From Swiss-Prot:
Protein name: Proline--tRNA ligase
Subcellular location(s) per record: Cytoplasm
Entry similarity comment: Belongs to the class-II aminoacyl-tRNA synthetase family. ProS type 1 subfamily.
GO CC term, one of those recorded: cytosol
Catalysis: reaction(s): tRNA(Pro) + L-proline + ATP = L-prolyl-tRNA(Pro) + AMP + diphosphate
Protein task: Catalyzes the attachment of proline to tRNA(Pro) in a two-step reaction: proline is first activated by ATP to form Pro-AMP and then transferred to the acceptor end of tRNA(Pro). As ProRS can inadvertently accommodate and process non-cognate amino acids such as alanine and cysteine, to avoid such errors it has two additional distinct editing activities against alanine. One activity is designated as 'pretransfer' editing and involves the tRNA(Pro)-independent hydrolysis of activated Ala-AMP.
Protein source organism: Buchnera aphidicola subsp. Acyrthosiphon pisum (strain APS)
Enzyme class: ligase
Underlying gene: proS
Taxonomic lineage of the native organism: Bacteria, Pseudomonadati, Pseudomonadota, Gammaproteobacteria, Enterobacterales
Amino acid sequence: MLTSQYLLSTSKDIPYDAKIISHQLMIRSGMIRKTSSGLYVWLPTGMRVLKKIKNIITTEMEKINALEILMPIIQPEYLWKESRRLNLYGEELLRFLDRRKNQFILGPTNEEVVTNFIGSEIHSYKQLPLTVYQIQTKFRDEIRPRFGIIRTREFTMKDAYSFHINQSCLENTYNKFYDSYINIFKKMNLNFCAVKADSGSMGGNISHEFQAFSQNGEDEIVFSNDKLYSSNMNMAESIETIDFFKKKYSSCLIKNKTNTKKSIIMSEKLNTPLINQIQTFLIQTKINDITSIAALLIRGDHELNFFKVEKIDIINKPLVFLNEKEVISLIGVKKEFLGPLGLKVPIIADISTFNMKNFTIGSNINKHFFINVNWNIDLPMPIFKDIRKVTKNDLSPNGSGYLNIKQSIEIGHIFQLGQKYSRKIQQSVKIKNGNLKNLYMGCYGIGITRIAAAVIEQHHDKNGIIWPDSIAPFEVVILPINMKKDNKIKIIAHFLYKKFKKTGIDVILDDRDERPGVMFNEVDLIGIPHQIIISKRSINYDNVEYRERKNKENILINIKDIKNFIIQKLKK
């Protein structure tokens, strides 16, 4: 590729809404342009990166015998009604009517369509197992698109689906995908980890997320310093949770000794440390289809884990907390003075509050608190559940390490779905005895566009992107200095360009009449890993100058040796 024939589209300006480095660099390097909230045009440089990401994924899919298909992005709504996910997905589904008033959606995922289609193609257990995949655009009507392409409304995914006659066959394919994802992300030089995760609206009992570390990531992952435990924040537990539910806490009532029990008092001042306080939240519940209220209690220095709270049977999903006006109307007090004493609603307390003594709570009287409160003496024992987020330095579930927390970007997710979709959409196959059996299913996703952002988050410096060779828009750039004024430089530049092209090296030649500083700045911004500089000074000694983007190392290499030198570099 010649730069004079290429849409470079680099920019010095950073848009006001580009808050994180990957978003800024993708715009400045000419990878993407925003058309509307959460919608982007991918320019040639960005498309070259996406193409290489797709090639790596396709190669790995072929290794595990996954067959490529392509499903429509528009899906009939009735399939989502059959799977009972239409309302579960909520307003993220973009729904519309065609001219005949038929109901459709723009697909955010394809479990319903693929189950329906595969069910009509597979009739016998002898055709199983079978795995299909596609690389396609998806759409989710995000309420708040942000962070560039990390959280968009339209995005590109690789989604794969496997079908099986039994659970053990599903587990075998699931493990193959797990290993395949490890290979894929390693080839892209990503610093990542795989963690246990919840299946959410997808369903199933087992799933793993693949998370790329990033200080700008939306997710939090939890892992122990002994490397024996990892989880996403939603599901993370500490040894406190494990120990608590091993015991029958209902028979282990707190017995305060007389010398430790202090008299409960009312105070206008809140001078106790957060670790000795209990916060109270009111939340909507549904018991026997009747909407009501429950109270949630956590320690003052802890944070509610919304995911864990939603797992409680009586809690409405999504969570609906009472606001200030509603609390005042119901209890007659501002939220900050809300407490559990005297509340005539179900009370659910985090297990970390179980052993608390002489703690502080809101008094349900404005500007007052109760101090020196104790369970079973001043307050009846509530229902205890694990409803908090773990914190740094909590003991890990096995008790042998301490928990650490890092921010991350989810780049892949795999699920064992079991028979969830085949039962609801009524897809079955004939087994050996002639009976019909519902298919077992797995589903495996990779966020292709999101990977590009994750790599940039991990591989950049003050000058721009530092792409790994495997997904760089170009592997090599040739930078002839003052080529228009020196014909020898021009001849050597085009000679090397043709030589690299013939060898299959992905190369671009900057043949513009630009100042050296502009050329160097642009290739550093774009992040081309291997740079060859041709100047009058170097060619006088039959040399060219090689510079590696990631370490700025400059080496003089003889012109006749440069091709083999680059080939060896690309093999590493």
